[in-house]
């Protein structure tokens, strides 16, 4: 191994220390604010859904979320529904079977994880209920993204930015809606939205967006 060599870090969500060091010049770096297809990042919308845990306790999906999901299922657009904990996956998946019996859920320890993700890519599964394990590495045309319980602590600014980044990645269909369904807006939600808006603004100024 060489005694002197460059080490390059690549991240979509640098932490506050990295941002501070970059601003003050302690750490060198560049910001790539545009996507290869030259379209802006989808900016998340906030939608208050009430006490969603209470709704689930009564075996119901919050109405505003259900209406949103139904709209895109009917349009035959693929959907990721992110939930804050694995314990909600099966419960919500079963409650949503009325929309389409093929709706399924997946988590990190799921032995059928790869098969389900591939079926989702092919369109055989219209909606996947999942956790933050599917933040990265999945590109699906026309993908719509929802987060239930976006106010939960696990959904940090970086996690919410990564989740929003699942939408609009396809070259053929570089658009998609991202909605944070919540029972109280958090600072992480606000920062995530601001982060994405800032990236779009920077990309526009650099001529990286058509």
Language-model-detected regions and their locations in the chain:
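Conserved helicase motor
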Residues: 84-87, 103-117, 129-137
